[in-house]
Design a protein with these regions (language model features):
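Sec-dependent bacterial lipoprotein signal peptides
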Residues: 1-20
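Beta-propeller-forming repeat regions
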Residues: 5, 21-364, 370-373, 395-396, ...
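Domain-scale activation on soluble regions of proteins
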Residues: 374, 410-431
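A short acidic-to-branched-hydrophobic micro-motif
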Residues: 375-395
């Protein structure tokens, strides 16, 4: 809110200055959001950037990934002292971005290298020890003129010097981790399909002899995916570290691909993708892989339709989600938990064992902010079992909701239930409703 007020004040100020005949030439959002004047180390670093740029500069912020700052402080060489990596565009240049690597020596900041990318933006940045020497490499994906496909570059730093380790691989997104369990990190690079690139996952490893990166293993990816929604490193089983990739097609259908390196076969695997077969995780829902049981491993969602009347086009039916672990030896999903998810009000309800064989469905009424759970008799709705109602906190605290019992609340909403029919064979008790309910935030979704 403070930032919004600051921007509003600055915009108003610019209008007044404009009316007085002054000319403001660089009033971009990036400049508006630049931090206050730096002091100490930050001031010295910005002075080095200004000196290098000479004619003025604009800080460039990575668009994606873990590191979103234009000036990143991190210990590259493992000496417990931070180096600085800064991204900026020289005001005299329009199609290049500089990466300035700086280090502190004798209480003064010096430049290790000024690396120039032929690009207008930096997509993402990461740091990982790819060589096994205890020092972190700088990994940069810079944008290109091909939409959603960038160019991967990698640099090592030691004793005030920066060397290029690898450059030139096409890359839409990347993650790092020890995927072959050899004690050092690798880069897993993903490329979306274009007329110039196959949809591909590549595991890039460091070669000590050539002092460069090479593709140790590759796997085909789904060419119908046009956008990545979520790419996350996760433990699978048998001490294997893999990646789950949630991607979306042009018609907004999402699927999940699981990528891992098979040490026995020395190949990269993507078993959920088969060229002539439907991916079992294909779904129109917005859910992505999540660690729903907090065991440190991401679960993979499979969406099933709840039963509905064929002629019913009015009601909004909830989704049934089966959360699965991944069995690496069998290369198959293993069901762990079934839930009914409501995306409108961001909660889910455990799908009880007694509801097996499509005995229950759920309908959301947006006007009344209620999701009703019904018994299903095979062709139509039967008895209403219970309902979940979402109240604004202020309304709930006013006491105008005597028929409902509180489950949980946050700053905005109170989540409540009314157990309408607790005595059928498939009914839930009050305690079962309370323990089976969770918000998507609570579940990490």
């Amino acid at each position: 809110m403070k930032i919004k007020k600051l921007i509003s004040a600055l915009v108003l100020g610019s209008m007044l200055v404009g009316l007085s005949g002054c000319n403001i030439t660089d009033f971009s959002a990036e400049n508006l959001l630049r931090p206050p004047k730096a002091v100490g180390d930050e001031a010295e670093i910005e002075q080095l950037i200004a000196k290098t740029a000479d004619s003025g500069y604009t800080l460039k912020y990575p668009k994606n990934g873990k590191f979103r700052s234009a000036i990143i402080m991190t210990d590259l060489d493992g000496n417990d002292s931070n180096e600085a990596v800064a991204f900026f565009r020289n005001s005299a240049e329009t199609s290049s971005v500089h990466m300035l690597v700086m280090y502190s020596k004798d209480n003064s900041w010096e430049i290790a290298s000024d690396n120039i990318f032929e690009t207008t933006d930096i997509d993402s940045v990461d740091f990982a020890d790819l060589t096994g020497n205890g020092k972190a490499e700088i990994i940069v994906n810079s944008t290109t003129y091909t939409p959603n496909v960038g160019k991967l570059s990698c640099y090592s730093y030691s004793e005030g010097k920066t060397n290029e380790v690898g450059s030139g691989q096409s890359c839409s997104s990347f993650v790092t981790g020890d995927f072959d369990n050899d004690g050092t990190s690798e880069i897993m690079s993903f490329v979306l399909y274009t007329t110039e690139n196959e949809a591909l996952a590549s595991m890039l490893d460091y070669n000590e002899d050539s002092k460069s990166l090479y593709a140790k293993a590759m796997a085909n990816m789904d060419p119908n995916v046009v956008k990545y929604k979520n790419i996350a490193v996760t433990k699978l089983d048998n001490d294997i570290t893999g990646i789950v990739v949630d991607g979306t097609s042009a018609n907004e259908v999402t699927n999940t691909q699981v990528i891992f390196y098979s040490r026995d076969l020395a190949i990269l695997r993507n078993p959920l993708f088969k060229e002539k077969a439907k991916n079992i995780t294909r779904r129109s829902s917005q859910v992505i892989c999540s660690d729903i049981d907090k065991d440190g491993k991401l679960e993979i969602p499979v969406t099933l339709d709840l039963p509905k009347q064929s002629s019913d086009s009015k009601n909004i039916y909830a989704d049934k989600i089966i959360w699965n672990s991944f069995d690496t030896p069998k290369e198959a999903l293993v069901a762990k938990q079934a839930v009914i998810i409501n995306y409108d009000y961001m909660f889910m309800m455990d799908y009880a064992d007694k509801w097996s064989e499509n005995k229950v469905t759920a309908i959301t009424d947006l006007e009344s902010e209620t999701t009703s759970f019904y018994a299903w008799n095979g062709t139509k709705l039967d008895t209403e079992l219970f309902e979940i109602k979402v109240f604004p906190v202020s309304e709930w605290e006013s006491g105008k909701s005597d028929d409902f019992t509180l489950i949980t609340k946050d700053d905005k909403y109170a989540y409540t239930f009314n157990n309408i029919n607790p005595d059928t064979q498939i009914s839930l008790s009050d305690d079962e409703i309370k323990t089976g309910f969770s918000t998507l935030d609570q579940s990490g979704i």
